[in-house]
Amino acid sequence: MLYKGDTLYLDWLEDGIAELVFDAPGSVNKLDTATVASLGEAIGVLEQQSDLKGLLLRSNKAAFIVGADITEFLSLFLVPEEQLSQWLHFANSVFNRLEDLPVPTIAAVNGYALGGGCECVLATDYRLATPDLRIGLPETKLGIMPGFGGSVRMPRMLGADSALEIIAAGKDVGADQALKIGLVDGVVKAEKLVEGAMAILRQAINGDLDWKAKRQPKLEPLKLSKIEATMSFTIAKGMVAQTAGKHYPAPITAVKTIEAAARFGREEALNLENKSFVPLAHTNEARALVGIFLNDQYVKGKAKKLTKDVETPKQAAVLGAGIMGGGIAYQSAWKGVPVVMKDINDKSLTLGMTEAAKLLNKQLERGKIDGLKLAGVISTIHPTLDYAGFDRVDIVVEAVVENPKVKKAVLAETEQKVRPDTVLASNTSTIPISELANALERPENFCGMHFFNPVHRMPLVEIIRGEKSSDETIAKVVAWASKMGKTPIVVNDCPGFFVNRVLFPYFAGFSQLLRDGADFRKIDKVMEKQFGWPMGPAYLLDVVGIDTAHHAQAVMAAGFPQRMQKDYRDAIDALFDANRFGQKNGLGFWRYKEDSKGKPKKEEDAAVDDLLAEVSQPKRDFSEEEIIARMMIPMVNEVVRCLEEGIIATPAEADMALVYGLGFPPFHGGAFRWLDTLGSAKYLDMAQQYQHLGPLYEVPEGLRNKARHNEPYYPPVEPARPVGDLKTA
C-alpha cells in the first residue's frame, strides 16, 4: 500500500502501474475538502515514485464521485473572498499535479461523475466509462460555476459549443452522448471496465497511443478562430439570457469567463475561473440554491426514513377520472404501480384514458419510450364504471368534485368495497381531512393526498395527517408518492392544509391592491420580472380557474374568518359572476385563444377593465416595492403561522413545498430562506408599514421574537476553516 486515507487509497497494480481508488465510508464518494487534501497527499507519494509508468483512477462504489460535498458549501461560502480563493487555488494545484504526472493516466468511470467528480476525471488523459454513466457539471444550478478547472478543461477538450451547452445549463449527459462529444474515450460493460482501462494504459505506456498529445490541448489556449468564438459565445449568451434571466447570475458568468479565458493557457485561465467563482459563491442566489438542494435531500431522507418498514403499494386505484384522475393514473402506471380508474361517467373515463394516452404519446415523441413500452404502461390502467378489482387494491385516492358531501359519500361507499387494510386518501385541495374522515368506519386508514396540476410535472404531493390517521397509513401513502417520483411532504390538517392556506392570503393581497386601484397587468409584471414568480397572480388565477379560486376562497374564509373573511366584493367575485373562469372557458383576466400547438395564448381584453372598475377605486400607480411587499407579506405571515401551529414541521419542508408546489422563485430559496436573507427585523419594519390593511398584515408573535433577538429560521452556519487547517481524509 503506497498511501491510505479515510476516503481513498493508492496501491501498485503491476509493472509500474498504480491505482488510486476512491472508497469513502458510506454508500457514495464525495469530493469534500478532506478528500481533496488526501488526493493531494496521494499525488505527492506518486511524484516520488521513480518507477511509476501509469496511473489508473477508479471507484469502489456504484458511482465514481457524485460531486463535491454540498453540505460544506454554505460554510465555504461564508469565508472571506481571499480565503475562498486560496482554497480554490489549493484544490486546483492538486488537479494540476494529477494532470502533470510524467506518465499516462486514465479514469475508469462508473455511474455518476458530477461536478467535482467530473472535474477530477477531466484532469486525466483518458476516460473509459460504463453504460450507466452520468457525467456533467451541474454547478450553475447551485448558483455557482465549476471551480476545479471544469470551465477551463472541458472547452479545450470538447470545443466551445459542447462545453458551453453542458456548463451554462448545468447539464449531465449519458454514456452514448459523452462518447459522441469526446467527454469519454470509450464505453464498456461494467465487468470489463478495469480490464479495458488497463489495456488503454498499456498502449499509452508502450507508445501505441500518444498520451502527451492528448494532454497538450488542455494546457493551451482554446483553439477557436475569431469568427467561431464570436458565434459560439454570442449564441450562448443569448440562450442564457433567454432561459436563466437576470435572477440567475451563474450561467452568464460562466459563459463570459470561458470566453475571457479562451485566449490563455491553463494557469491564467484557472485564475480567471477562480476570480469569477468567488463572487458568485457570496451571492444570496448561491446560498438559496444550495439551500434548496440541501432541503431537497432532507425532505427525501425524511420520506425514506418514514417508509423504511413499509411495503410500497403494488396495486392502486383512482376514484374520479377526468384530467386530474387520468394524470394520477398515468403517473402511477408510468412508475410501475398498476391502477384501476373508476368513474360513474363513461365520458369522464374516456377523458381520463385520453389524458394518460396523451402523456405517454409525448414520451414516445421525445424518444423516451418505444411503442412496446407505451402499450405496456397503458395496459396497466384499468378503466371501470364499477368496483371490479377494488378488493385487490392496496391504496385508493379519491379525486372527485371538490364538494364535501360528494366526497364523503364516495369515500364511505368505497370503504365497503375494499379490504380492511386498504388505505383511502382524498385529493381534496381545501376540505379538512378530519371532516371527511367522519364519514368512515376506519378513519385511521384515511388521510389526504393533495396532488398539484399538472400531475406529471408538479413534483410536490402534500400528505395530510387527519386527527385519526395512523402512522402506518401516512407511511404507505408517502411510499406510493415516492414510488410515483414525487416529493411527499407530510403536513397536519387544517383548511387549505399548507400550500393553499398560504396561497390564498397572497391572492387576498392581490385583491386588495386591485381594490385600491392597482393595474393587474403591472402587478403580474412586477411579481414575474422583479420578484421572480413563474406567473403573476392574475395569470395564475386564470390557470387555476376563477371558479375554483372563488370556491376555495370561501372555504378558507370559513376556516379562518378572523383573517380571511373579507368585507368587500373583490375582483375574483366580479369575474366569477361574469362567468369568466380563466383558461378553462377562454375568459378570465385575459382572453385566451389556442396557438398553433393547441396551447392557450393570452390576449388583452378591454371588457375586464370595465368589470374591475365596479370593484376598484380609480386607477393609480404603485411602486414595485409596494406591490412586492403587499403581495408577499400576507403569504409569509401565514407560512410562519403554519410553522408555529405545527401544520408544517420545519422551515426546510415549508420552503420545499412552496418551491415545488407553487413555483416560489428558487433563487429566493423559499419563504424562510427569503426571510433569513432579508433579516427578520427588516421584514418586521416593512410589514408594520402595511398593518393598517388588516389582520393578514399583522406579523405573528414568533416572527416578532426572531426580529427582537436577531435570530434566523435556519440554523446558523460556521465559516469553513482556512486551507492551512485542512485535515486529510
Curated annotation (Swiss-Prot):
Keyword Ion transport among record annotations: no
Record protein name field: Fatty acid oxidation complex subunit alpha
Binding positions (NAD(+)): M324, D343, V400, V401, E402, K407, S429, N453
Function: Involved in the aerobic and anaerobic degradation of long-chain fatty acids via beta-oxidation cycle. Catalyzes the formation of 3-oxoacyl-CoA from enoyl-CoA via L-3-hydroxyacyl-CoA. It can also use D-3-hydroxyacyl-CoA and cis-3-enoyl-CoA as substrate.
Binding positions for substrate per the UniProt entry: D296, N500, Y660
Chain positions of site Important for catalytic activity: E119, E139
Residue ranges of the TM segments: none
Description of how the protein assembles with itself and partners: Heterotetramer of two alpha chains (FadB) and two beta chains (FadA).
Catalytic activity: a (3S)-3-hydroxyacyl-CoA + NAD(+) = a 3-oxoacyl-CoA + NADH + H(+); a (3S)-3-hydroxyacyl-CoA = a (2E)-enoyl-CoA + H2O; a 4-saturated-(3S)-3-hydroxyacyl-CoA = a (3E)-enoyl-CoA + H2O; (3S)-3-hydroxybutanoyl-CoA = (3R)-3-hydroxybutanoyl-CoA
Source superkingdom: Bacteria
Species annotation: Escherichia coli O17:K52:H18 (strain UMN026 / ExPEC)
NCBIfam families: FadB, PRK11730.1
Database matches in CDD domains: crotonase-like
Region feature (Disordered): 708-729
Region of interest (3-hydroxyacyl-CoA dehydrogenase), residue spans: 311-729
GO cellular component: fatty acid beta-oxidation multienzyme complex
Active site, renumbered: H450 (for 3-hydroxyacyl-coa dehydrogenase activity)
UniProt keyword list: Fatty acid metabolism, Isomerase, Lipid degradation, Lipid metabolism, Lyase, Multifunctional enzyme, NAD, Oxidoreductase
Protein family according to the UniProt entry: In the N-terminal section; belongs to the enoyl-CoA hydratase/isomerase family.
MF annotations from Gene Ontology: 3-hydroxybutyryl-CoA epimerase activity; delta(3)-delta(2)-enoyl-CoA isomerase activity; enoyl-CoA hydratase activity; long-chain-3-hydroxyacyl-CoA dehydrogenase activity; NAD+ binding
InterPro entries from the UniProt entry: 3-OHacyl-CoA_DH_CS (IPR006180), 3-OHacyl-CoA_DH_NAD-bd (IPR006176), 3HC_DH_C (IPR006108), 6-PGluconate_DH-like_C_sf (IPR008927), ClpP/crotonase-like_dom_sf (IPR029045), Enoyl-CoA_hyd/isom_CS (IPR018376), Enoyl-CoA_hydra/iso (IPR001753), FA_oxidation_alpha_subunit (IPR050136)
Pathway: Lipid metabolism; fatty acid beta-oxidation
PANTHER family hit by this protein: TRIFUNCTIONAL ENZYME SUBUNIT ALPHA, TRIFUNCTIONAL ENZYME SUBUNIT ALPHA, MITOCHONDRIAL
